[in-house]
Each structure stands twice: as structure tokens, then as C-alpha cells.
UniProtKB/Swiss-Prot annotation:
The chain crosses the membrane at residues 8-28, 41-61, 74-94, 97-117, 138-158, 175-195. Part of the energy-coupling factor (ECF) transporter complex CbiMNOQ involved in cobalt import. It is found in: Cell membrane. The gene is cbiM1. Keywords: Cell membrane, Cobalamin biosynthesis, Cobalt, Cobalt transport, Ion transport, Membrane, Transmembrane, Transmembrane helix, Transport. Belongs to the CbiM family. It is a multi-pass membrane protein. One of its GO terms (cellular component) is ATP-binding cassette (ABC) transporter complex. GO terms for molecular function: cobalt ion transmembrane transporter activity. This is Putative cobalt transport protein CbiM 1. Forms an energy-coupling factor (ECF) transporter complex composed of an ATP-binding protein (A component, CbiO), a transmembrane protein (T component, CbiQ) and 2 possible substrate-capture proteins (S components, CbiM and CbiN) of unknown stoichimetry. PANTHER family: COBALT TRANSPORT PROTEIN CBIM (PTHR43627:SF1), PTHR43627. It comes from Methanosphaerula palustris (strain ATCC BAA-1556 / DSM 19958 / E1-9c). One of its GO terms (biological process) is cobalamin biosynthetic process. Pathway: Cofactor biosynthesis; adenosylcobalamin biosynthesis.
Length: 231
């Protein structure tokens, strides 16, 4: 999903920076407020950031100018919401661009928008929707994590198709081509990521359910149900 350095035309680089900036600014505000109110969340923030870094660094070849990999953003979106997750994501993306030749600084805005904003937003909405209909918490975490991953690549496909429309068929043909190539590797990766993050969520609930309850991620009753069902 990381679009490589210098691959996008300048106007699209500037456009995605402009679109992403308000989300990052609000995320920084939310993050500062959260840390001031509850410093006990710092270790969990670090865990969410580490998941994003490690999983999104496991890249596989895909379309020219990009790659396939898990995103790891679903866990942060569930725990802290999409805006704080966007801040964690941009930190990871800057580090990867500077030290791992993964992504790029000129394409940072585009990469943040797809992986750090759109993916977490959908994951957060899916999780909140699942809570509203009393969906099983473990199933809910799996769906939110997996769909956040897949939606990230839908957005990347849109970004690439807008920048490089097909000579015959235009934007839609280009989008179908990019999305089809991504789907070959990304659907299995999203399923694996969903399972992995679900297991991580269960473990966090075992050792620090109080933080999840305080953040409103799950209720005391849901925490107890998870412990009883998977003990």
C-alpha cells in the first residue's frame, strides 16, 4: 500500500497532504488530551504503534509503485479511535520512509490518508456499529481489523487510478486493475491480520481489562464474557 517516493505527480502529493492535515491536527489534539487525562494508556498506545510499525513493514510485491502488507491500524482504531490512530500511523510512515525506504516523504500525505485515516475510520465505524447491535466482541474486533486493512487498499487503488487513469477506460478501468492486483494478496493478509489482532485484543482484556473499560471499548459485562468464553 505504501506508494513509493516520487511516484505520484506533484499536484496529487500536495492534494493528499492538504486532505490529511486536518485529521492529523485533530488527532494530535485528542492524543494530548488523552495522555493528560490518563497516563496509564501510554503503554497501550505504544503497543498499538508497534503493531502498525511491525505489520506494515512486512511488505510483499504488488502493483508498480506500491506493495502489499498488513496495516495493523485496526487495533488502534478500536482502542483509541481513528484520529489518534492517524497520528500513530504518520509517525510510523515517516520512520519507514526515512530509514527503511518504505513509502516516501513526497507520498506521505497519500499514504497517511489511506492507511492512517481511511482504514482506521472504517474499522472504527464497523466496531461501533457492531457494538450497537450487540455483536460478539471477538467477531466485532476481527471484522473491524480485517475491513480496515482491505479498505486501506481500496483507497490506495483510488489514489493510483486518479493519478494514472488508463488510456482506454479511464479512472474506472485503472481502479479495477489496481484493486484486482491488490486483492490477490490483500484478502488473505486481511484475514490473517484480523485473527492476529483478535488474539491480541483477548490478551489485553486478560491483563488490563480496566483500560479497555475506561476507554469505552468494551463494557464490564463484555469483558467478563470474553474471559469466560475463551478461558
Amino acid at each position: 500500500m505504501h506508494i513509493m517516493e516520487g511516484f505520484l505527480p506533484l499536484q496529487w502529493c500536495l492534494f493528499w497532504f492538504a486532505v490529511s492535515a486536518p485529521f492529523i491536527a485533530y488527532g494530535i489534539y485528542q492524543l494530548n488530551r488523552l495522555v493528560k487525562e490518563n497516563r496509564s494508556t501510554l503503554p497501550l498506545l505504544a503497543v498499538c504503534g508497534a503493531f502498525i510499525f511491525v505489520l506494515s513493514s512486512l511488505k510483499m510485491p504488488s502493483v508498480t509503485g506500491s506493495c502489499s502488507h498488513p496495516t495493523g491500524t485496526g487495533l488502534g482504531a478500536i482502542m483509541f479511535g481513528p484520529f489518534i490512530t492517524s497520528v500513530l500511523s504518520i509517525i510510523v510512515l515517516v520512520y519507514q520512509a526515512l530509514f527503511l525506504a518504505h513509502g516516501g516523504l513526497t507520498t506521505l500525505g497519500a499514504n497517511v490518508f489511506s492507511m492512517g485515516i481511511c482504514g482506521p475510520l472504517l474499522g472504527y465505524w464497523v466496531y461501533q456499529g457492531g457494538k450497537a447491535i450487540n455483536l460478539n466482541s471477538i467477531v466485532n474486533v476481527f471484522l473491524a481489523s480485517a475491513l480496515a486493512d482491505i479498505f486501506t487498499y481500496v483507497i490506495t487503488s483510488i489514489q493510483l487510478s486518479l493519478a494514472f487513469p488508463a488510456a482506454a477506460g479511464g479512472y474506472m478501468t485503472s481502479f479495477i486493475t489496481f484493486a484486482g492486483i491488490f486483492a490477490v494478496t490483500q484478502v488473505p493478509l486481511a484475514i490473517i491480520e484480523g485473527i492476529f489482532l483478535t488474539l491480541t485484543f483477548k490478551y489485553i482484556n486478560q491483563i488490563r481489562p480496566d483500560i479497555l473499560i475506561h476507554l469505552g471499548v468494551i463494557s464490564p459485562a463484555q469483558s467478563k464474557q470474553i474471559l469466560e468464553a475463551y478461558s
